[in-house]
Amino acid sequence: QANGTLGRSRWLPLDPVDCVWSRWSEWTPCNSCTKIRHRSRSVEVFGQFGGKPCQGQPIGEQQRCTSDAVCEQALPSECSSIEFTCESGACIKLRLSCNGDYDCEDGSDEDCEPVRKPCGTKLYDTNEQGRTAGYGINILGMEPRINPFNNDYFNGMCNKVKNINNNEYNRLPWNVGLLNYETIAEETVSKEIYEDTYTLLRELMTETKLTVSAGLNLKFTPTEKSMAKSNTTVSGGVGLDAEYDRTQMIKEVSEYTTIKNKSFMRVNGRVQLSTYRMRSRDLQVAGEFLEHVKSLPLEYEKGQYFSFLEDYGTHYTRNGKSGGEHQLVYVLNQDTIKDKKLTERKLQDCIKVGISANFDTNIGIGGDAHIRPGHCKDTVNKNTAEKEGKALVDKVITVVRGGTLEAAVAMRTQITKEGLMDVKTYQNWARTVGDAPALLSSEPEPIQTLIPLSMPDANTRRLNMQRATQEYEAEYSVCKCKPCHNGGSLALLDGKCLCLCLPQFEGLACQDAKADNNKNTKTPVRVFLEKGNWSCWAAWSGCSGGKRIRTRSCNTQGLSDATCRGDIVTEDYC
């Protein structure tokens, strides 16, 4: 039941909530080999209501140190008589040496004249889909920094596939079990106008997150120091550039939560070029990945494991679809929509490009291009509208993933200048997608499953990695936020708590009824059921009778008669 029927348009002023960190843990003992020690901490409260966010600060910290202990490193295992010993110490099959392929990542197996090339005299390139297969995925939406796989390894095979985009054959890395080319183009335009920021933001965040099991908690910016010598991101295409990334779109849309009289429409375009599947066994991971796994302490230390997860991802891609996509969010002026009596259908006809299903990346869009109605020039065109002082489109927020940077810049420039994208600009971008495809969708597999069981202490490392993934998601959770008013939902975006309001409310905490709702005083504003926010789960109890339990509480700070849906206690086998 609602708490009454008369809503208050103003609540007491909200106090900004600043980020609060826990105390640092004790330093670990000094590592006698690296001469480095580590410590870590946690976020206790995330910034909210205009307070200081927990942004850019790491969970873990490291420091140079001195140690009198002797550095004891395990000697590399000796290769067998039927194996070749790489300069790095890695072992490969003897038959793979002197075959023209760098089966040793350092190339030491090819200090000789090739005598038996797998593909004979033919030279086949590995395409971008093959080189970047297995992309890492971060459960909180961040782009990982390093690919865990060695996709320059072929295991002496010459498996190839015909690339229908250029009619050339490409050689498949050993890790890729299957690569199919099939070009599919589609365009979707939102069926209705988003009347508020919160509905759009909720939709964007839900699409971005790998799982919604623990609410809308997203982290786009890495904060932990990389384990790599150079920070090189691995995913293909323009999606890496912050200016074009979907994470930037969410950040820009979130800035409109405090701006009134704005509506939104979305246009999504996608060109899918291929699907791939990784092998189910005997995957070849990179030597650097193995070295980083070995460098992780057997005694769990949160900060070091978090660094690994931000480098490689919490999961890798077992199956994936590659290609390119663009997303446009039109920020519209509500007053202009009303003045011009514009309908959703009229706006849809104006802002869509008109991508046909008959798509060929060599020639562009097949068939007749979509012709916009005559009213569109005056309705959407930014230059015309601004001269008349009746701008409908305040801004177009653009995301481009896949394709070359030059083509993406041209697309963005066209949209920024005209407010619309023309077919030619779209075609020019689409032709470059095959050169730099992005991962469009994926089937994830936990990253710890890539740790070879033959590695010393493999089970301990796998369990530590599994624990780190669970703690990583729990660290960046909305359970560390204050509850919202009037049925608003919580979201966590890069260390800052946001309230996503129901359409009738606005404000940092959804504490204000919208002005339109109060114009007719005879129709009181309904107060929606207040939702409390669950605290974070307490630590697990000791094991008793093969079971353990943990508890949480309902945070109703500042709310009246609020409740939380769900269980206070959960149990697990032990």
From Swiss-Prot:
Residue ranges constituting the MACPF domain according to the UniProt record: 115-480
Signal peptide coordinates: none
Positions bearing carbohydrate: N3, N231, N261, N533
Role: Pore-forming component of the membrane attack complex (MAC), a multiprotein complex activated by the complement cascade, which inserts into a target cell membrane and forms a pore, leading to target cell membrane rupture and cell lysis. The MAC is initiated by proteolytic cleavage of C5 into complement C5b in response to the classical, alternative, lectin and GZMK complement pathways. The complement pathways consist in a cascade of proteins that leads to phagocytosis and breakdown of pathogens and signaling that strengthens the adaptive immune system.
Keywords: Complement alternate pathway, Complement pathway, Cytolysis, Disulfide bond, EGF-like domain, Glycoprotein, Immunity, Innate immunity, Membrane, Membrane attack complex, Repeat, Secreted, Target cell membrane, Target membrane, Transmembrane, Transmembrane beta strand
Localization, UniProt: Secreted; Target cell membrane
InterPro entries in UniProt: LDL_receptor-like_sf, LDLR_class-A_CS, LDrepeatLR_classA_rpt, MAC_perforin, MACPF, MACPF_CS, TSP1_rpt, TSP1_rpt_sf
UniProt gene name: c9
Cited PROSITE patterns: EGF_1, LDLRA_1, LDLRA_2, MACPF_1, MACPF_2, TSP1
Domain LDL-receptor class A, first and last residues per copy: 77-117
Membership in a protein family: Belongs to the complement C6/C7/C8/C9 family.
Subunit note: Homooligomer; about 20 C9 chains oligomerize to give rise to a huge beta-barrel that forms a 100 Angstrom diameter pore in target membranes. Component of the membrane attack complex (MAC), composed of complement C5b, C6, C7, C8A, C8B, C8G and multiple copies of the pore-forming subunit C9.
GO cellular component: extracellular space; membrane attack complex; other organism cell membrane; plasma membrane
Segments forming domain TSP type-1: 18-72, 531-572
Domain of life of the organism encoding this protein: Eukaryota
Membrane topology according to the record: Multi-pass membrane protein
Keyword Repeat: yes
Coiled-coil segments: none
Pfam families to which the protein is assigned, alphabetical: Ldl_recept_a (PF00057), MACPF (PF01823)
Disulfide bonds: C19-C54, C30-C65, C33-C71, C79-C91, C86-C104, C98-C112, C119-C158, C350-C376, C481-C497, C484-C499, C501-C510
Principal location listed in the UniProt entry: secreted
GO aspect biological process, one term: cell killing
Stated name of the protein: Complement component C9
UniProt entry tagged with the keyword Membrane: yes
Limits of the EGF-like domain: 481-511
Transmembrane regions: 212-219, 235-242, 344-351, 352-360
